[in-house]
Amino acid sequence: MSKINKLEQIRNIGICAHIDAGKTTTTERILYYTGKSHKIGEVHEGGATMDWMEQEQERGITITSAATTCRWQDKVINIIDTPGHVDFTIEVERSLRVLDGAVAVFDGVAGVEPQSETVWRQADKYNVPRMCFVNKMDRMGADFYRCVEMIKDRLGARSLIIQLPIGIEENFKGIVNLIKMKAVIWKDESLGAEYFEEDIPADMQDKAAEYRARLLDMVVELDDTIMEQYLSGAEITEEQIKILIRKGTIEARFYPILCGSAFKNKGVQPLLDAIVDFLPSPIDIGIVKGIEVSTSEEKDFPISIVEPFSALAFKIMNDPFVGSLTFIRIYSGKITSGATVINTVKNKREKIGRMLLMHANNREDIKEASAGDIVALAGLKDTSTGDTLSDIDKQVVLERMEFPEPVIELAVEPKSTADQEKMGLALSRLAAEDPSFRVSTDHETGQTVIKGMGELHLEIIIDRMRREFKVEANIGAPQVAYRETITTACEIDYTHKKQSGGAGQFARVKIIFEPLKDVIDLKDEDKNKTFVFESKIVGGAVPKEYIPGVEKGLNNIRETGVIAGYPMIDFKATLVDGAFHDVDSSVLAFEIAAKGAFREGMQKGNPKLLEPIMKVEVITPDEYMGDIIGDLNSRRGQIQNMDPRGNAQVVTAHVPLAEMFGYVNTLRSLSQGRAQFSMIFSHYDQVPSQVADMIKAKK
C-alpha cells in the first residue's frame, strides 16, 4: 500500500443523493468495475455490498455510511456511501465533514428532490467540491436537460455540462464526451464492462458543438493566458481543458455534470475517470482548522504525512465480529497499531489495537495508516463521534461537528427484568454510534424515552435493539419533541448557602440569561449551538476551578424546562460575577447555585414553548391541488411556494410536526393514491398560546 498511498493519489469522496436516486447502485457498479466486487449486488434483490445491515437489505435504503476503499487508474478512492432518507441526514453531515469531494447523484426522471437540496446545502456548509451524475437515463420520463435546469434553479449551482446522453429512455446507449468530442457506446452483452469510442452521431453533432462551446467559454475564464489563446482562435488541448475543469471544480466555480444509467451499467467508467481527474486530493484541500491545546489558539494545520498525528472520529459502528469500530479520517502524520494516542476532547489516552481497511463489510487488517486515509480502529474505549485523536506531544482539537436537536420521541419499556439490563446497554451503544439519537428518563413516570430525527429513524433503532441486542420492549406512540426557550434577557444574582454542622456549602453566582437570537457578538463556532455558556469573570471573583461546575449545573438542569418540563434551548448564559468561601465553596456548591439561578432566570425571561416545524413537499396531479392545500392549511401549515413539475404540481409548506402524524393516509385518500410527500425538519418555532395550553394540560 505505502508506495502508491501518497497524498496526491488519494480521493476521499462521498456519494450522496435523495432516496431512490440510485446512489447505492452507482457505488456497487464502481466497486464492480474497480475490481473489488466479483458480482454486482442489486439493491432491489437485497444483495448490495454497501447496504450491509439487515434492516438496509430489507428496506432497500442505505442507513449507515459504509466506508470502502478501491483503486482506479493508479489512484486510491475511499468511498463513503451516505443515506438518502431524510431521517438520516446526520449520517450525511458526518460523512461530508471528513470528505474532500462528493458525487451528487440525481434521478434523471425526478430531478432535484427535497433531500438533494438538504445534502447540497450541507456540502456547501463544509465547502465540499462536487460533481453531479444524472442517473437513470434509461427510465421512462428521464430528461437530462430538465434535470440540469433544476440543478441550476433549485440549487443555484453553476453547471458545467461535460457529457450529453445519446438516446433517451430505453434507447439510451451511451454519452457524448464533450472534452474529447467523441461518442462512448456501451455493449449491453458485456454487462457494461466493454465500451468503445466512435464519432459523434450525425444528428447530435450540432448540439455537441453548441455544448462544447459553452464548456470552453466557462473554463477559459479561469486562466488569462488560455483565454487569450482561445479568443485568438487557437485550439485548446484536451489536457488544458482537464486542468481547468479540475481547478474550477476544486474552487467550486462550477460543478461538472455527467450522465448515465448505473443500473444498466452505462456511464460508470467515465464517472470514475472524472472522480480521479477533477475531484481534489487531500493536498488540494491543504489545511484543516483546529485548536492547539497548549495555547488554546485557533490555527490552520497542514494536511501532511510529516506533521504530528491528528485524526477525526466520524463514525462509530457495532460490528458483529470485531465489536465496536471507530472510523477515523487521518489529517496529518501516521499511526501504527499498538501506538498510544490521546483523545483531546475527553483528555483520555487510547491504545490503538486492530486497524482495519474496510470494504463494505469485508475487512483487511493493516499495520500502518497515514494522512489522507480513512480507516476503522477496533477497541477504542472513550472516543465518540466528533472527537479528535492526536499525537500526545503535540495536541490539537479539530473542528467539531454540530448535531441537530431530535424532533420526535417515544417511550420504551422492557418486557422483562432480563430485558431491562440489556436495554440499557443496547441504548447506550446505539447512542454512542449516532449523536442524533438521544436517550433520557422521564422524571415523573420513570420511563425511558428515546428521541430521534423521524419515525423511520426510531423504527430502525428499535429494530436493531431487537435483532442485534435481543431486547424485547413495549413501544409507546410517537410524541413530538417540544422545547422551551426564553424571549427576554434577565440578570440573576443567586446565592446557595447551607450550614448544618461541619463543612457548609457556599456559592454565589451572577448570571445574565439572554435569547441566542438577541446576542450580537455570537462567535462563529457558537452559531449552530442551542446553548452557549461564557464566563466573563475577572479578578478571581469565582476561582477558575469552580467555573466548570457552573456550566455543568446549567447543562444538567436545562434538560427540564419551567413551562412543561421540556428541554430549554436557544439561550446564552454569561457568568459575570460571584463570590466564594475559602472553606465552604466547592464545584458542587457552584453547580447547585447555577441550577437555582437557572430556575429563577427561566421564569423571569418570559418563557415560551417551541415546536418542531417541518418542511413538507407534496407532489400532486393538478386536480387534487385545492384539496391538498386546504388540508395543509387546516394543519396550521404555511404554504411557501407552488411549482409545476412536468404534469404535476409541487407544493412546499412549513407545517408543525404535531399536525403531520398519519398524514400519509390522508394524502392517499385526498389524491386517490397519486400524490406523494416528503418532509424534513426545518426549525423550531413558538407554539400558539391555545395549543400551548393543551400541551401543558397533557403534561
UniProtKB/Swiss-Prot annotation:
Keywords: Cytoplasm, Elongation factor, GTP-binding, Nucleotide-binding, Protein biosynthesis
GO molecular function, one term: GTP binding
Entry keyword annotation includes RNA-binding: no
A family per Pfam: EFG_C
Compartments reported by the entry: Cytoplasm
Positions that bind GTP: 17-24, 81-85, 135-138
Family: Belongs to the TRAFAC class translation factor GTPase superfamily. Classic translation factor GTPase family. EF-G/EF-2 subfamily.
Protein name: Elongation factor G
CDD domains tied to this protein: EF-G, EFG_III, EFG_mtEFG1_IV, EFG_mtEFG_C, EFG_mtEFG_II
Organism in which the protein naturally occurs: Rickettsia prowazekii (strain Madrid E)
Any one of the GO BP annotations: ribosome disassembly
Task of the protein: Catalyzes the GTP-dependent ribosomal translocation step during translation elongation. During this step, the ribosome changes from the pre-translocational (PRE) to the post-translocational (POST) state as the newly formed A-site-bound peptidyl-tRNA and P-site-bound deacylated tRNA move to the P and E sites, respectively. Catalyzes the coordinated movement of the two tRNA molecules, the mRNA and conformational changes in the ribosome.
PANTHER family registered for this protein in UniProt: RIBOSOME-RELEASING FACTOR 2, MITOCHONDRIAL, TRANSLATION ELONGATION FACTOR G-RELATED
Every tr-type G domain range: 8-283
InterPro entries: EF-G-like_DII, EFG_II, EFG_III, EFG_III/V, EFG_IV, EFG_V, EFG_V-like, G_TR_CS
One GO CC term, this protein: cytoplasm
